[in-house]
Structures are given as C-alpha cells and as structure tokens.
C-alpha cells in the first residue's frame, strides 16, 4: 500500500514539493525556481521532474507515491484539474491536472493555493481537531480558505472564499479586482505598509525614521516594532489597521460561524499583540448576533509548509 503522497506549493517565484507520510508529516522537500514566464508545457515538465527528484533524493520509489496534489493560484476546477485562469502565470484554460497525470503516471489533484493552505492547517495545523474553520492569510492581498464539516467550501464555480474582496468601505480604495473598498485594500500586510509610509511622510519626528531612512525599506513589521517602543504615530497606524482586520473577521464570524479562525502571513508572527485586539474587536462587533461560544482566533501553525501539506492531503478532501 502506498505510504506517501507528494504536495506541491506552486508560486510565481518558487515551487516547493514535499514528500508527506500518512501522518501528514513532511519527510523531505525540495524547492526550485518557477522561472516565469515560460510555456505551460515547460512548467508541467519541470513539475514532473521536481516530483521525481524529491522522491529520489529522499530514497522513495515513485511507485510508492499514492498521488500528487498541487496548490496553484487561479481559478481551479477541482473535479477536472483544469485551471481556468492564472493571473500570476498568464495561462488561460490550463489543463494542468490531466497533463501532469500523463507525465507522472499517477493521480494528480489540483486545488486553489489558498484552499490547499487552509486544508493543511485543518489537517495538521492550527485548525486541527475542528470541523468548521476559516484560514485567513494577510499578505500582499488577503487569501482565505473555508472548511465546513471537514470539507473545503469550493462553490459551484470553484471560486468560493474570496473574503479579501468583500467590500467594507463604500466607494473606498480601488482594488485590483475592479471593486472599491475591498477588505484586502485595508487589512492586508501591504495595506499596513502603505499606511505606515503615509504616516511617516506626515510625521518627520516619528522614531520610524530612525529605524529606516528609506521608505522603500518600510514593511508591515516596522510599525509594530515602533509601537512597541512607545511611538504614538506607529500606535495609531497599528490601531487603525487592526480595526480593519477586526471588521473582516467579524464578517467571517457572522457569515460562517466557524469554530476556529486561523490568521497567517508574516504579520501573524506578532502573536497576541495582533490577535488579542482583533479578538476583542470582533467579539464586540458580533456579540449581539452570535450567541454562545466565541470562535477560537489563533495564528496559523504550519507557516510555509501549509500549502505543501494541504496539497498532499487533497485526496482526503473529496
């Protein structure tokens, strides 16, 4: 009986493949550059080579691989393995799953990368042990994956869970999706970076200027570090940003009432400095609607391994 699966986290810069055992533990992994742009056929061959190489490097016979799972950006039909459109790669109507099955000679599952990462947290991370979970990643945008009754919520067009594009400010900041006021324009890590830069430009006396003299080096962590040193300007930026995070989390609770919400992305490394006020804000916003036990709000545990583990577990998500 096959003991291993391979999970692939396919990104625009790198692609990582991991050999995962029956306990959802990574026993070996390998990362290669994605090397875009290139034809889809070339990338498929590289993915097949990556799978065979990670198996060989870890002394696993490829015949012992039960299946391969892939998490990729884009609109993914999980049933067919068909990627309708991948904006990161510029591929339209990409027949990824069937093509890779032909190259590898085994079953291949393809899933949206946010869903795969969420499933990883559900299987082996911060959402383990819960039936209903939402995983939110605060990064360049806001990624989200929803697990209800132990199953990924995909929607009839396989596009469910785009929580980052829920509008929270009418006629607000323009979003790349075409709408205005989307949650990710206010609560993503890039939104925090944008507001930090604006605050620094408005206040030349903030200690953030002593921490970096170049606005191009400002990141989402800077305001947290400055606020911890007592900087009032940084504290105002953080408080405003956390309120926007809390608004979206309250919407998640009112919509899905999950048992647990896991927050990921680099800013989640702030731990309770981030989580405690988000928890308090969301609880206050939902207390007159949601009765009973408030959802657990915690940080993701698997970090960069969530996508690999989730992809490797896709066969159990059916």
Region annotations inferred by a language model:
Residues 1-67, 77-80, 98-108, 123-130, ...:
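ATP-binding/phosphotransfer module of carbohydrate and carboxylate kinases, centering on a glycine-rich
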């Amino acid at each position: 009986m096959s003991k291993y699966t391979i999970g692939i986290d396919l990104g625009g810069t790198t692609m990582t493949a991991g050999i995962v055992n029956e306990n959802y533990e990574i026993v070996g992994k390998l990362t290669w550059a994605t090397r875009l742009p290139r034809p889809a056929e070339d990338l498929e061959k590289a993915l097949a080579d990556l799978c065979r190489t990670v198996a060989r490097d870890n002394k696993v016979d490829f015949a012992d691989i039960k299946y391969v799972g892939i998490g990729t950006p884009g609109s993914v039909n999980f049933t067919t393995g068909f990627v309708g459109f991948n904006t990161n790669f510029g591929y339209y109507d990409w027949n990824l799953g069937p093509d890779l099955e032909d190259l590898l000679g085994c079953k291949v599952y393809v899933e949206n990368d946010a869903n795969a990462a969420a499933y990883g947290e559900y299987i082996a991370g911060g959402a383990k042990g819960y039936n209903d979970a939402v995983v939110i990643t605060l990064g360049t945008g806001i990624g989200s994956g929803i697990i209800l009754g132990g199953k990924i919520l995909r929607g009839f067009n396989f596009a469910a869970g785009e929580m980052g594009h829920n509008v929270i400010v009418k006629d607000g900041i323009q979003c790349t999706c075409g709408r205005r006021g989307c949650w990710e324009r206010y609560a993503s890590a890039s939104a925090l970076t944008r507001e930090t830069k604006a605050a620094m430009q408005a206040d030349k006396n903030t200690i953030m200027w002593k921490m970096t003299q170049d606005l191009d080096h400002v990141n989402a962590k800077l305001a947290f570090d400055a606020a911890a040193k007592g900087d009032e300007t940084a504290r105002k930026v953080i408080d405003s940003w956390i309120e926007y995070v809390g608004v979206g989390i309250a919407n998640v609770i009112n919509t899905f009432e999950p048992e647990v919400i896991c927050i990921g992305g680099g800013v989640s490394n702030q731990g309770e400095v981030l989580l405690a006020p988000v928890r308090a804000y969301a609880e206050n916003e939902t207390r007159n609607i949601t009765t009973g036990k408030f959802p657990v709000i915690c940080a993701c545990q698997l970090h960069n391994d969530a996508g690999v583990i989730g992809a490797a577990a896709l066969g159990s998500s059916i």
